[in-house]
Amino acid sequence: MAWPCITRACCIARFWNQLDKADIAVPLVFTKYSEATEHPGAPPQPPAPLQPALAPPSRAVAIETQPAQGESDAVARATGPAPGPSVDRETVAAPGRSGLGLGAASASTSGSGPADSVMRQDYRAWKVQRPEPSCRPRSEYQPSDAPFERETQYQKDFRAWPLPRRGDHPWIPKPVQIPATSQPSQPVLGVPKRRPQSQERGPMQLSADARDPEGAGGAGVLAAGKASGVDQRDTRRKAGPAWMVTRNEGHEEKPLPPAQSQTQEGGPAAGKASGADQRDTRRKAGPAWMVTRSEGHEEKPLPPAQSQTQEGGPAAGKASGADQRDTRRKAGPAWMVTRTEGHEETPLPPAQSQTQEGGPAAGKASGADERDTRRKAGPAWMVRRSEGHEQTPAAHAQGTGPEGGKGRAVADALNRQIREEVASTVSSSYRNEFRAWTDIKPVKPIKAKPQYKPPDDKMVHETSYSAQFKGEANKPSAADNKAMDRRRIRSLYSEPFKECPKVEKPSVQSSKPKKTSTSHKPPRKAKDKQVVSGQAAKKKTTEGPSATKPDDKEQSKEMNNKLAEAKESRVKPTSDASKNRGPVTKEPHKDQGSVAPGLPKGQEPLKDQGPVVPGLPKDQVPVVPGSLKGQSPTAPGPTKDQGAVLLGPVKDLGPVAPAPIKVQDHIASELLKNKDSVPLAPAKAQSPLLPEPLKNQSPVVPASTKDQSFPTPAPRKDPGPVIPEPEKDRAPTVPERRKDQHVSIMASLKNEAPMVPESVKNQGLAGPELVKDTGTDTTAPRYLKGHDSVFVAPVKNQGPVIPEPVKSQDPIIPALAKDQGPMLPEPPKNQSPVVLGPIKNQDPIIPVPLKGQDPLVPAPTKDQGPTAPDPLKTQGPKGTQLPTVSPSPPVMIPTVPHTEYIEGSP
C-alpha cells in the first residue's frame, strides 16, 4: 500500500491497520503505538521475547532504518518468508537468511535483527521496553459475561409512531385468527389468538407488556410452552438491532409455523419447536441478519428434520425450545432480532393454531410471553411491535398459559379482555394507531428575547481605521452635502504641504500609470496620446489624485503640466518606449500631435500608436499623416523605419500603409480609403512581400519576411478569408513584394484580404500584382529602402501580417512565419499583439489580435519604439511585445493601432 498521509487522523487509523499488511515497513518513530509492534492478527506478544534476543541492546533504543550488515541481509530478508507479525517475521527471516547462507544475514538476525532495510520483512518492532498497552481496543471485542445494557435510555423512552404493517388494517377486525385458535381442539390453542392486538399497538401494547411477564409466569403450564418458550427466548436480550430481532421473531416463526404445524402435528410436533429453541439457546454467531434468517428460515426447513428427529419429543417442545432459544440473547442487530421475534410469531399464530392443535399448542403463546419478558433489544417501538404482534398471541397465551388446557375459553376471555381494554383506552384502533401522541404535555414555546437591538441612533460608518485617514477638513458634519464635501476636499488638497507631494506623486505615478493607461485603457490612452503625453500625464495624475480629490482642477492642471513635461522627456523614451514603441514612441508620444502633423491626423488612430507616429515622421512624416489617418496604427510600425507606413497600414490595413508610408501620404490616404477593402488583397500579395520586407527591414523583415508571407495570413486572421488568398497570392508575390513592399503588402493583404483587389490597385502593395509592379511595389521598395519598418507598416495593416513582423519579433513570427496564412491565428498568438495591432482595418480584429499582437507590437516596438508602444498600449502584452519588438524593429507593424487605440483616437 502506498504510504498514506499518515498525519491525517483519517489516515492514521488506516495506517495503523494496514501497517502489518504493508509492503514496506514504515520506519516511523512512534514510541507509544502498540499497534506498530503488535499486529492485530499476530499472536499476542509471545514473539516479544524473541525480539530482545534478536536485537542487541544497543538497538534496543530505536528501530534501525539503515542497513546494518549490508544489502544481502535486506534482500534475504525480503526474500525470506516473512508473513506474520514483525516478530514472527524476524524469526522467519533469520532462518531464511541463514539458509541462504548469508552469514551476515544470520548475524544480523541474531544480532541486530532486521536493521538493514525498510522492507516489510525487515520491519522490527522496537526493542524498547514494551510501551504501555494501548487503549485502542484489540482487534476483536471480547464481550464480557456480564450482560450489556443494550438499550439506551433513548431507546427505552422511544415510542415509535405506529407504522402500519403491510396488510395490517387495524380498522378491520381480525376474527379469523381466533377461530383458527379455537379450531384446534386443544384448548391451549387460544394462544396465537390474533395480531389485532399488535395492531392496536397503542395502550394495548403496554398492557400486553405488563401482562406479559405475569402471563409468561402464569403460563407455567407446558401447554403454554411455546409461548413460554418464545418468551424465554425473548427473555434473554436479543442481540442486534431491534428491527432485526423483531423480524427474526416475526418472520422466523412466520414460516416456521407451517413447518411446525406439520412437525408438531404428532405429539412431537412441538419437538421442532424445542429443537429450534435449544438450538437458539446457544448464542447464534454471525451477523444478526444471518442469524435471523437462520433462525427463521432455518427453522422453516428445520422443522421437518427436527420434527422427525424429535418426533418422540414433547409437542410443546418447540414452543419451549423457541423460548429457550430466545432466552439466550439473539445475536444480530436488534432490529433483525426484533423482527424475527415479531414477525416470526405474527404469522406463527395461525400456523400455531394448526400446529398446536396438539395439546402444546398453547405453549407457543406462553413462550412468546416469556420471551417478551426479557427486555427486547432494539428500538422500543420495534420491540413493542414485535411484542405487540407476538404478544397478542402471547397475551392470549398468558390467559391460557396456565394449563393451555383451559383452552379456548380462557383464550377467548383473555382476548376479549384485551380488546375491551384497548377499546376503553382508545376509541378506534385506527384512530389510536395513527394519531400523534397525545400523552405528551405540550411545551409552551418560549419566545426568546431578540438578541440584537438595533442602535437607535444612526449608524456611524466610521472605523478606527478609516478615521485615521480623514482630511483635516473632512470631518463629517451634520450638514454634509456634496458641494461642501467637494470644497472641503479641494481645500484639503490645495494646501501647500499637501500639494507638493501631490504633484510629485502624480509625476511618479504618471510614469507608471502612464504605462498602465497605455496597456489597460487603449481608448483613453489614445485620447491621452492625442492630447499629448502631457494630457496623458494629466489624466494619470488626475486619476491618481483625482480619485482622491477630483475637484482639484488647478492642481491637476499644474500637475498635468509637470507631468506632461516629465512625460515628454520621459514618455518619449519611457512612455512610448514602455508602450513598446520604445524610442519612437517617446517622441511621438511627447509630441504625438506634433510628431506627425499628418500623423496626428492619422494619429488619432495612431494615438494608440502615438509613438509610432514619431517614428514615421522620421521616415515619412507626410506619409504618415495620410497613412496614419488611414492606418495610424501602422504608422507606429513604420515609425521606426517607416513609422508612417506602419501607421497607415495599421489604421486601415497595414498593407496600404507600407507603400503609403513612404509614399504614404497619398497612398496612405488611398489605402486608408481602400484600405479596408484593399488590405485584404494586398495581404495576399503581400505575404510574399512580407518576407522580403523582412529582408529589407532587417529586424522586422528577417523574421517577418521569413514567415511574413505566412504571418500575413495569420494576421489576416482578421480578414480570415483573405489570408488564404493572400497566402496563395502572396507566395508568389512574396519574392517581389518582399523586396519592394513585401511587408507592406503582406500587412495590407493580411488585413484586408477582401480588399485585395482594390488594395492591390490602390496600393500596389495590396495587390499581388501591385506588389510586383505597382506603386506599391515602388512604395514597398521605398519603404523598405526608406525604412524597413515600412514593410512593417504593412504588417501592421495586416494585423495578421504583424505576425510576420512578429517573426521579426522572433517570438511571434516564428510560428506565424511557418504557417503564415493559417498561422495568422497562431501568429497572433505568438505576436498576438502584432496581429491585432497591425490590423487597423480589423479594428475588431485588433482587439483580439491585440492581445496576440501585443507581442507583435513589441517587435515593431523594438525597432520602432513608437509603434510597438502604441500597440503595447493597446495591448496589455505591451511588455511582452517589447521583447518581441527588439527582434524586429521593422515589425513596427504594430499596426497595432488597436481597436482600442482606434477607439481612443476618435
UniProtKB/Swiss-Prot annotation:
Region (4 X approximate tandem repeat Mc): 222-405
Region of interest: Disordered: 37-56, 65-411, 441-651, 674-782, 817-906
Signal peptide: none
Record PTM Phosphoserine, positions in chain: S98, S185, S207, S632, S687, S905
Tissue expression: Isoform 1 is specifically expressed in adult brain. Isoform 2 is predominantly expressed in embryonic brain; expression persists at low levels in the adult brain. Isoform 3 is expressed at high levels in lung and at lower levels in testis, heart, muscle and kidney (at protein level). Oligodendrocytes express a major isoform of 89 kDa (O-STOP). Astrocytes also express an isoform of 60 kDa (A-STOP).
Mn 1: annotated span: 116-139
Compositional bias of kind Basic and acidic residues: 119-139, 147-171, 496-505, 549-573, 715-742
Residue ranges of the region described as Mn 3: 427-450
Lipidation (S-palmitoyl cysteine): C5, C10, C11
Gene Ontology terms describing biological process: dendrite morphogenesis; lysosome localization; microtubule cytoskeleton organization
Post-translational modification: Palmitoylated. Probably depalmitoylated by ABHD17A, ABHD17B and ABHD17C. During neuronal polarization, palmitoylation and depalmitoylation cycles regulate MAP6 shuttling between secretory vesicles and microtubules, and its polarized distribution in the axon.
Known role: Involved in microtubule stabilization in many cell types, including neuronal cells. Specifically has microtubule cold stabilizing activity. Involved in dendrite morphogenesis and maintenance by regulating lysosomal trafficking via its interaction with TMEM106B. Regulates KIF5A-mediated axonal cargo transport. Regulates axonal growth during neuron polarization.
UniProt name for this protein: Microtubule-associated protein 6
Source organism: Mus musculus
